[in-house]
Amino acid sequence: TGYGTDGTIWGGEILLADFDGFRRIGSIEPFLQAGGDLSAKEGWRIAVSLIWQISESKDEAMQIIRKLGLCEEKEAKVQLAMLERKINAVESTSAGRLFDGISAILGIRKKSSFEGEASMALEFAAEAYEKRSGEKKINVLDGQKCLTESADDGRELLQTSRLVRAAVEVVSNIGENAVAEDTFDQDLIEKAAYEFHKGLAEQIVTACIHAKEKTGCRTAALSG
């Protein structure tokens, strides 16, 4: 994660590169990263931003935040105000922060005491479901079924907001009382963590297949 050539925070990019340079041809959907350095440590802040992005109004966002028990009401109002007015908020396509936000939404980790803690906990939850359920590895061809769209600059956007909505729906369906008492149905949460990883992987595969079709490049290198 770091600042990209356009002054926004990058970290979930698909780059076409050679020894002479690179071109950004895809990314996860942008969201606002509000709260400065705290947003990198407190995943609930990213979760608030992701929820605000998929909501039709600030009231709807507040209702979801309250139902999920993400933070104190006062904190949520301050965070939403920053997002609405773009105060101390920068556009971001950081995959790491997306993972932190999903981890907070699912009630796995709302804050991190070290870099990557929330994302690691999300991964462990997904692995627990995979081991318990006997789910097989993802069939890469499934990626063709995922939807992507084009950004104004022509790059392909992975529709990560669909994954956010799915995570919110899982926790919302568990029930308000369970969230308030921190008694999440562990099986459902672990399955949701697995489905997030699977869904994102399928979207990445889709974008890579499209990139190969457009550019002829057949080599994919993963980093991060």
Where are these regions (language model features)?
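Gly/Ser/Thr-rich helix-start
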Residues: 3-5, 97, 108, 224
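Phosphate/diphosphate-binding loops
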Residues: 1-55
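Glycine-rich phosphate-binding loops at beta-strand->alpha-helix junctions
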Residues: 217-224
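A contiguous, well-structured pocket-lining segment that forms one wall/lid of small-molecule binding clefts
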Residues: 49-217
